[in-house]
């Protein structure tokens, strides 16, 4: 969400970043017909949502999470997929092509929106050419591919997308390098609250000492 927001901001769009990222949707006061909302919608919010509909919706992955809330994986997936099931004709649903649970759910549900499956294993020239080390990890590369595909549908200027990619710093506490010496790099990834969100940075590093904490979900 943060990356897409910054891409749109660099395109001089009237854009608001809201939702689970920390800014309540209802706190936004000045909006017009051209205002674009980039919303991070959690399964908690979607669970009781009946009418929320987004023209462009994305599910990057699905893995067991928030089971203490939803009780079963099936109910968790049902809440997440409301994001796509509430869409109508002319809307766009962006999903990870090589995700087993997403593929299974797509077969079980007929969606009204146009489904765009993103192959996260495919190389992208913009990523290959960037000197921004933030996008070297698997997770951040996937985030970029989703933001890039949405940007293409929105017909955003490629040059400005490239500008944003080169200078993007990411989120605080998300794969944030807080110390680096010759043989030691300390990474703060405390914003990752599940194994599926941590696996990208683990795959991108070697000789790891992984410190975990928090409440089991």
Residue ranges and their predicted role:
Residues 21, 25, 31-135:
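Flexible active-site lid/hinge loop adjacent to a nucleotide/diphosphate
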